[in-house]
C-alpha cells in the first residue's frame, strides 16, 4: 500500500522476511525522485519493546526523508505488527532482524545499496551498533542513548545492593522456571529497565509491558562493545543526553 506521508515524502507499508517470520515496516521516499535515481537510505530502529510508530522512529524518518534519504522503520519480531512470539525481545534476534531489513532495503529500486546506514535510540541504538559491527554492509551508524555492556548498564540501573540482588535473583528464577515448566517466567518491564514514575508517561503507546525473563538475560549478556571496533573505518556517531534518567550517559561507550 502506498500513500502520502508527511509533506515532501511518500510512505509505503511493506513486509519482509527475517528467519522465516514476516516483519512489518514502512518505507518512505522523498518527492521528486527521477526514474532510475538511487538515493542513500537509513534504517531507523525502535526502542525496548516499542514499535515502528513511536515518535523516536517516525520523526527521524521524516527528517531524513526531507533531507533526501529513503528510510525504513519496522517492527522487530514479536513487536508491533510483526510476526514472532509476542514480547519475546532477544538482542541477537533483533540484530538478525536488522541485517535482514538491510537485505530487503538493498533491493529497493531507488536505494543505493552501498550507502545504507542504521540508527536507533536506547535499545535500538545498542542493536544498531552491534549490527554494524557484524555486518559490513551497514555504511554508517547513529546511536542515541545506547549502551555497550549489558552487565554494566544493569548495574547502574539497579544501583543499590538490594536492587541488584533482586534483579539477579529474577534472572536465576527465570532459568529455574524455564527448566521446571518449559515456559517463560514473565517479568514487568520496569523490573527489567527501571523508569522513574514521573517519566513513564513517555513510554510509547502500545509498548510491551511484560517480557519473558529470557529478554532480561539476553540484555545482560549483550555486549556491543565486543564488536564496535569492527565498524571502523565506517562513521559512527554516539549521541547521549547528559542527564539521561534511564540509561546512564557513560554506558554509550562502556
Predicted features, each with a name:
Residues 2-37:
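N-terminal cap/lid segment of alpha/beta-hydrolase-fold proteins
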